[in-house]
Amino acid sequence: MASPTISSMEQYTPSSKDEKIVPLHGDAAGSDTEKGESREVFQENVDGVEFRTVSWQRATVVFLKINFAMSILAIPGALGALGSVGGSLCIVGYTSLNVYTALVLGDFKHNHTECHTLADMMGLIWGRWGRELVGVQIIVAQVLISAGGIVTSAIGLNALSDHGTCTVMFALVSAILITLFSSIRTFARLGWLTWFGFITFVLGVFIFVVAVTQVDRPAAAPKTGDFELGWAPIAYPSFVVGMINATNIFISTCGSSMFLPVISEMKRPHDYRKACLVAGFIVGAMYLSFSLVIYRWCGTWISTPAFGSAGPLIKKVAYGVSLPGLILGVGIYQHVAAKYAFVRILRDSEHLQANTFTHWGTWLGINLALGTAAFIVAEAVPILNYLLGLAGSLCFAPFSLVFPALLWMYDFKSYKTGTLGQKIKYGLHILIMILGFYMIVAGTYSVAVLIKEAFNTGAIAKVFDCADNSGFVQ
């Protein structure tokens, strides 16, 4: 069957309108590599900054750090709301689905190499306005995730210092450190720091997981007397509680939209699939095993973030070991948003890869603006679960479900009227898109209800609050 035709888009498509592509994520394989390389955002062997230096192994570590992050501190609580069976099914199901849609995005990127981000891809379908709207959505998503990282880092600094100063100051220090890391220009130079961040974060989580099996009772449980652990294979939460916890599990592995800028900096973009599959398997296995152990020993008495569940000493040890990894991981999220805005502003200009004042001023200015925005959001909604829920429903549900399904249907539009098997594939992608729309509406509604409730009950007392947010400090 004939391959779909690339839509002409004046800003990005220098090739003729009748040039054919061969989608990889389907029945055919292969591509015009030479033409694809010529349309890549970053070129090799340039007089300036060399961006195309990332190996597939280093890309794997970046993908691991993007996905294995502060969500592990929220997922055990999600199992408390959904039960071990319901939570496990969500982890396995969402991880598998997110890995699949990540492959869809990678194949689309390979077929349309001029696309640097998801905004560029959606611009092929929706035009200039679509590209700009999705671009804004990318920035909003990363600001929400960065804000969640600032909140969690401030909790860690509070725990380590026994609330040594105003929480706002800890949040400010966290925002500065995250912004400094995100300002490193290339993913290759982020590489060794990313390795360090991933190892320290996993080590901190592992220390906590082992420690939580050795305590008599979770720190949040009653100090004396009998208590009900609350562990259950199947739980029956309210719609709002169930939805936000399912969304928090979903967001844990839906960082595929942030993989795309990394592809543009890989030595061999074709190795993306290998890196994506390896990272997806490792992350899914760690989330499932760690979360089930934590839930088994803490039940419904899980602190948020989860490190507080093992008591004040272990919480300090876990935060002390993992805090560098947490800050470095959130810095990658902010780096992706900054790289999008940077390329958007300087694309096709001499300043994109040249060490000019305009190059540096634009890059550092964008990072400063994003860090400031994330700090303000963190102080306005200082609860990790709600920030993750907002990001998951408003941004990552479209990024990981709706948009990949639309892009697949764009490249395989002929499947709509093809053979029975092709029609079934087309229909399955429509179902993925419908699931995404459901998560947008239901997830946003659930988070809004809980945030309103938090303000009404005093869980969020005020913005820019100096009070200790770490809990159980003794």
Curated annotation (Swiss-Prot):
Molecular function as annotated in GO: L-amino acid transmembrane transporter activity
UniProt keywords, alphabetically: Membrane, Transmembrane, Transmembrane helix, Transport
Membrane topology: Multi-pass membrane protein
Residues covered by region (Disordered): 1-39
Ranges annotated as spanning the membrane: 72-92, 133-153, 164-184, 192-212, 231-251, 275-295, 317-337, 364-384, 387-407, 431-451
Record flagged with keyword Transcription regulation: no
Polar residues bias (residue ranges): 1-15
Protein name per Swiss-Prot or TrEMBL: Transmembrane transporter FVEG_12640
Originating organism: Gibberella moniliformis (strain M3125 / FGSC 7600)
